[in-house]
Amino acid sequence: MSQFPEVLDNNLLHAENNETAEYIQNDGTNQSEVFMEHPYTPNMHPINMPSIVEGAVHPYNNLIHHNDAIPPAKYASMRQMTEDFWREKKQKMTEISEEDMLNKSKNMSVPMARVKKIMRIDDDVRNFMIASDAPIFMAQAAEFFIEEMTAMGWQYVSEARRRILQKADIASAVQKSDQFDFLIDFLPPKTVPTTSTNGPGHMSEDSFQDPNMHSDFHQRTSNSSVNRSHHN
């Protein structure tokens, strides 16, 4: 029909594949946009995506390959990560100014009241005075302690090519270091993931079970029954 072009806006031109629309602005400049029928998902393959007109601005070009791949571990080993961690912390504490130190002491991540309470748990310490800067030193040491264990957990996750940090990762990473032997009694035992009903790849805290739990239980029960028989 001859009146059909008059119905359309003169500033809008539709492409033949209905995937691009080129806007001709009043000043004569052109701007192209791509309209996607389906939103981007991490598992979308480029061959399944709509065709892209050459020269058009595509907002997802930089996400197709970079968002899917899990980056490799930054450090080759846990020891290298730990050495770099403490080198950075030492340099940071050496270069800190007095003003920053005062501000840091007033805004500690670890509660100062909790630190003072822990420092007075020992009966031998209750009879002595604690200097005002001692809790600040202990609070900063506690922050470094937490940061190091977290960094070790992330290194363990990166080596396993995963994205989510779980408490089992921190426990596994800490158990590899001799300097954390005093935490063995507080760390959960090494566990194996089990299948969850929430979907593939999903692992909750309840899905971790100790493979030796049942054998240890039966061994303890059998030993207790033997001891009762001897007493009888």
UniProtKB/Swiss-Prot annotation:
Broad class of where this protein is predominantly found: nucleus
Tissue expression as described in the entry: Expressed in certain parts of the gonads with high expression in fertilized oocytes in the uterus and mature oocytes from the distal to the proximal arm of the gonad, but weak expression in the syncytial ovaries and immature oocytes at the beginning of the proximal arm of the gonad. Expressed in the excretory cell, secretory cells in the pharyngeal terminal bulb wall, in the small ganglia surrounding the pharynx and in the neurons running anteriorly to the sensory organs in the head. Not expressed in the intestine, the hypodermis or body wall muscle surrounding the pseudocoelomic space.
Residue spans of biased composition, Polar residues class: 220-232
Domain of life: Eukaryota
Pfam families: CBFD_NFYB_HMF (PF00808)
GO molecular-function terms, A-Z: DNA binding; DNA-binding transcription activator activity, RNA polymerase II-specific; DNA-binding transcription repressor activity; protein heterodimerization activity
Null allele phenotype: RNAi-mediated knockdown results in ectopic expression of the homeobox protein egl-5 in the head region. RNAi-mediated knockdown results in ectopic expression of tbx-2 in the gut and seam cells of L4 stage larvae and adults.
Main function: Component of sequence-specific heterotrimeric transcription factor (nfya-1-NF-Y and nfya-2-NF-Y) complexes which specifically recognize a 5'-CCAAT-3' box motif found in the promoters of its target genes to regulate their expression and control cellular identity in particular tissue types. In association with the components in the NF-Y complexes, represses the expression of the T-box transcription factor tbx-2 throughout larval development, which most likely restricts its expression to certain tissues.
Protein name: Nuclear transcription factor Y subunit nfyc-1
Source organism per UniProt: Caenorhabditis elegans
Highest classification ranks of the organism: Eukaryota, Metazoa, Ecdysozoa, Nematoda, Chromadorea
